[in-house]
Amino acid sequence: MIELDLQCASTGAAPAAADLQRWCELALRQRSGDSELTIRLVDEEEGRELNRTWRQKDYATNVLSFPADVPDEFLDIPLLGDLVICVPVVEREAAEQGKTLDAHWAHLVIHGCLHLLGYDHIEDAEAEEMEALERQLLAELGHPDPYAEDSPETGICKDS
């Protein structure tokens, strides 16, 4: 079971907690046992500040992942880490890319959760593995391939 701590520090419209929970559970189902993670929904000001502080990028990005660095033996439930999602950026990207908000939110939550599990996309082989898993999980939800050649740019971690 995933214990989700949802923090809403945004005035924008966000998905229902049940949807966020469902997307996290889907992305994290390969992990056995209970886990805890936090999703913090922010506006552009906080998103920009966090991106500047942690990545030295002076703009708000869609999702930031902060894997926990606490040994499991010190916790009642293993802590996976935190996701920070900038609500206005998600809304803007979905509109610019011609995606439904639901599909884009699902993609970003899954993408962030996979980062918490250690997946990355710095090297081409790692990117292919991570994107293939994202495609599979999104297809299970009935969402289209966000990386399809005929779809608009995804905007996912375009600056990494």
Curated annotation (Swiss-Prot):
Q: Does the keyword Thylakoid apply?
A: no
The cross-references to NCBIfam families, in alphabetical order and at most eight, read: rRNA maturation RNase YbeY
Encoding gene per record: ybeY
Q: Which GO terms describe its molecular function?
A: metalloendopeptidase activity; RNA endonuclease activity; zinc ion binding
Which Gene3D superfamilies does the entry link to? Metalloproteases ('zincins'), catalytic domain
Disulfide bond positions: none
* Cofactor note as given: Binds 1 zinc ion.
Required co-factors: Zn(2+)
Give the stretches traversing the membrane: none
Residues reported in the UniProt entry to bind Zn(2+):
111, 115, 121
According to its UniProt entry, this protein's organism is: Stutzerimonas stutzeri (strain A1501) (Pseudomonas stutzeri)
Assigned protein family: Belongs to the endoribonuclease YbeY family.
Q: Which UniProt keywords apply?
A: Cytoplasm, Endonuclease, Hydrolase, Metal-binding, Nuclease, Ribosome biogenesis, rRNA processing, Zinc
The organism's taxonomic lineage, starting at the top: Bacteria, Pseudomonadati, Pseudomonadota, Gammaproteobacteria, Pseudomonadales
* Gene Ontology BP annotations: rRNA processing
Query: What name appears for this protein in its UniProt entry?
Result: Endoribonuclease YbeY
Which compartments is it annotated to reside in? Cytoplasm
EC code(s) of this entry: 3.1.-.-
One GO CC annotation:
cytoplasm
Instruction: Give the main EC class.
Output: hydrolase
